[in-house]
């Protein structure tokens, strides 16, 4: 994902009097609006404030007249350029025009929006205004006239699966309308992923030595790994069609290369099937927009599907709402559900995963709230009985934290690395619950299930370990304890090379201030901080294992055993995060939604992570498999829908 430092001053200036018309408001998807009552008196001048966004601190300079905020200048930030540009081009002008700090965030840039709004509100306070009143000022949305569309195919969601389905059907001459909650394609998860797993592609054949990987080999591995839980015929078909899905991506301009993943997987080197996408996010956005336009696909952004139009057991269309409340009716000959699972719905998390602690790995609030799954079940479809999630592999998170670990960057709070560095981990009672090395070696597969079942969990370390990570890092520290980075030994080790947690001391202090990290002079005091009743006994037993060099309880590799004896001691409260959820609608190998008697709902297809017949818990040990199945299923469903429409 491309990043840039802002060395020049990105300047946005406007006045409430001159205004920007309704352009800024319309860009936010708000339609016609009336401003809530707003009046203020300020000390004229310029004021600066800073707040943390998604990847960096954002500093703004605000200029005030006696009666209004007249300008906002971005002094510095290092957010994702294509996302932050929407905050600059849409949100800031709307704030200035309407003199309101309570506007909705840009849906694709929630954290960046929040940082800008918080910083501007701080400047309001410096200028003598009422910060809370400023943040409370909102816009009253007025819905537009009802809209009706008549199309061949309606696709719900424009993420990985929905995008693939849309362009695949559109290129075959079908009239496609796609509904997307986000304000642009930049806001969907599918555009940000590292790459798909696929077999027999031109990318694999083009590399030196070609490829020895075949469909049957991968099929047997994933079916045995999952104990034959997914739909076998669908899985085999996805793997067979994976090359065509990847060729579609290459065809729109994706530059891919086969690459080994950071942790050991069953397929790498001459059998590798992970396709790393080399295009920067900004370029991907351009490629997606062009591909949709070239395929003749119409996308309604800031639009949420609300229900299916059914004629008995046959799908006939979709109802939806725009962000301004406008009602939309889409009459369609077929419908593809690709709304991305339920990560953004805490109630469905609790229902299916038995936790409310699963956070969005990308930060902010996920737009994937289970809409497609609920619509399909309302129409008579049934769900599978396997539920899970695609875990974030970069560290713990916490809803209290301003900088949780969420991307392959070491600019987040380093203390969250203690959620998966192989050090001692305990549950809410202070008891061990896992072989800690699994979370370091295989954070997305073998290590993932127990952390969601035991959330929140706690990383326990002492000062000696903190000092070692601050000066040596995990790579040198673990090699000194006997690990080797040979294949089949400490495979992931090279990933940690030169990744030293040099800012750890200040990050620990930040965690203490935010309330998700505790520091104490004794283990007993540390236990009291989070109510970890059994922690003293656990540490005593764990230290015995460290002395023996053998974990007699869970078999953790000895190079991960780090004795806890040098105070002060630290506990990091961790919550899991995910890229997506698993568990959804049962389908056949044609992606048709099935009823309880296994007969299909005609014209209704379910793809991506809304589909419950392709995924498993814990997540696959094959990198890129979630994204691969998303694009595979989107490709297959589109072709099935095109044939059905005929």
In which residue ranges do the predicted regions lie?
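N-terminal secretory signal peptides and thylakoid transit peptides that target proteins
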Residues: 2-22
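C-terminal segment of N-terminal export signals and the immediately downstream linker at the start
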Residues: 4, 26-48, 61, 137-148
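Active-site- and interface-proximal helix/loop "cap" or "latch" segments in soluble metabolic
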Residues: 40-137
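Conserved N-terminal/central alpha/beta ligand/cofactor-binding core
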Residues: 184-298, 347, 425, 432, ...
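A glycine-rich dinucleotide-binding beta-alpha-beta segment and adjacent secondary-structure elements
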Residues: 307, 522, 533-618
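Glycine-rich loop(s) and the adjacent beta-strand/alpha-helix scaffold that form part
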Residues: 326, 331-400, 624-630, 636
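An anion/pyrophosphate-binding glycine-rich loop and adjacent beta-alpha core
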Residues: 373-375, 382-529
């Amino acid at each position: 994902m491309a990043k840039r430092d802002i060395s020049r001053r990105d300047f946005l200036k406007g006045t409430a009097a001159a205004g920007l018309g309704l352009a800024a408001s319309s860009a936010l998807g708000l339609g016609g609006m009336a401003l809530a009552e707003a009046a203020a008196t300020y000390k004229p001048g310029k004021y600066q404030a800073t707040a943390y966004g998604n990847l960096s601190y954002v500093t703004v300079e605000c200029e005030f007249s006696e009666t209004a905020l007249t300008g906002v200048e971005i002094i510095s930030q290092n957010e994702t350029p294509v996302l932050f540009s929407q905050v600059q081009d849409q949100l800031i002008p709307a704030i200035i025009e309407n003199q309101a700090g309570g506007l909705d965030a840009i849906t694709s840039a929630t954290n960046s929006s929040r940082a800008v709004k918080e910083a501007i509100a701080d400047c309001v306070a410096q200028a003598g205004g009422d910060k809370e009143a400023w943040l409370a000022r909102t816009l009253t949305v007025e819905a537009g006239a009802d809209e009706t569309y008549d199309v061949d195919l309606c696709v719900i969601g424009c993420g990985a699966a929905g995008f693939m389905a849309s362009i695949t059907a559109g290129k075959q001459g079908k009239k496609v309308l796609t509904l997307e909650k986000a304000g642009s394609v930049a806001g969907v998860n599918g555009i940000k992923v590292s790459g798909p797993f696929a077999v027999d592609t031109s990318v694999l054949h083009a590399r030196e030595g070609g490829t020895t990987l075949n469909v049957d080999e991968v099929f047997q591995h994933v079916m045995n790994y999952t104990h034959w839980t997914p739909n076998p015929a669908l899985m085999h078909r996805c793997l067979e069609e994976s090359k065509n899905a990847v060729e579609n991506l290459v065809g729109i301009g994706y530059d891919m290369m086969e690459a080994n993943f950071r942790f050991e997987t069953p397929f790498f080197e001459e059998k590798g099937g992970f396709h790393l996408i080399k295009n920067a996010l900004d370029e991907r956005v351009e490629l997606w927009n062009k591909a949709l336009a070239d395929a003749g696909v119409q996308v309604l952004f800031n639009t949420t599907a609300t229900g299916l139009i059914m004629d008995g057991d046959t799908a006939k269309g979709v109802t939806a709402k725009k962000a301004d409340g406008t009602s939309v009716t889409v009459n369609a000959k077929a419908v593809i559900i690709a709304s991305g699972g339920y990560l953004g719905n805490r109630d469905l998390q609790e229902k299916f995963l038995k936790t409310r602690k699963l956070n969005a790995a990308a930060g902010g609030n996920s737009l994937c709230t289970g809409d497609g799954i609920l619509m399909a079940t309302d129409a008579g479809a049934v769900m599978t009985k396997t539920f899970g999630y695609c875990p974030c592999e970069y560290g713990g998170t916490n809803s209290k934290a301003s900088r949780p670990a969420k991307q392959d960057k070491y600019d987040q709070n380093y203390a969250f690395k203690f959620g998966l560095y192989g050090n001692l981990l305990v549950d809410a009672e202070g008891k061990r619950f896992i072989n800690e090395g699994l979370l370091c070696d295989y954070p997305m597969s073998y290590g993932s299930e127990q952390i969601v079942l035991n959330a929140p969990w706690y990383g326990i370390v002492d000062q000696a370990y903190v000092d070692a990570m601050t000066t040596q890092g995990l790579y040198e520290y673990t090699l000194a304890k006997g690990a080797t980075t040979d294949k089949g030994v400490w495979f992931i080790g090279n990933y940690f090379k030169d990744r030293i947690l040099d800012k750890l001391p200040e990050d620990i202090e930040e965690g203490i201030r935010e309330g998700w990290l505790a520091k104490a002079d004794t283990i007993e005091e540390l236990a009291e901080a989070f109510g970890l009743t059994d922690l003293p006994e656990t540490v005593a037993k764990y230290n015995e294992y460290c002395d023996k060099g053998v974990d007699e309880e869970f078999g953790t590799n000895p190079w991960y055993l780090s004795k806890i004896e040098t105070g002060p001691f630290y506990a990091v409260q961790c919550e899991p995060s995910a890229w997506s959820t698993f568990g959804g609608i049962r389908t056949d190998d044609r992606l048709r939604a099935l009823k309880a008697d296994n007969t299909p709902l005609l014209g209704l297809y379910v793809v991506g992570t809304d589909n419950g017949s392709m995924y498993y818990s814990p997540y696959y040990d094959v990198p890129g498999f979630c994204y691969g199945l998303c694009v595979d299923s989107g490709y297959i469903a589109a072709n099935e829908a095109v044939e059905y429409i005929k």
